[in-house]
UniProtKB/Swiss-Prot annotation:
UniProt-listed PANTHER family: LARGE RIBOSOMAL SUBUNIT PROTEIN BL34M, MITOCHONDRIAL RIBOSOMAL PROTEIN 34 FAMILY MEMBER
Family: Belongs to the bacterial ribosomal protein bL34 family.
Gene3D superfamilies named in the record: 1.10.287.3980
UniProt organism field: Pectobacterium carotovorum subsp. carotovorum (strain PC1)
Descriptive protein name: Large ribosomal subunit protein bL34
GO biological process: translation
Length: 46
């Protein structure tokens, strides 16, 4: 059986990367929440 997680750095960054987050209003809200929480990493790419 094929596993469901087939890693790809490109797909990962395009959907969850910093620039993808900054591109939409809701994405910026995600970053703001993570900053407020004090996350060391705001997104997978940065």
């Amino acid at each position: 059986m094929k596993r469901t997680f087939q890693p790809s750095v490109l797909k990962r960054n395009r959907s969850h990367g910093f620039r993808a987050r900054m591109a939409t209003k809701n994405g910026r809200q995600v970053l703001a929440r993570r900053r407020a929480k004090g996350r060391a990493r705001l997104s997978v790419s940065k």
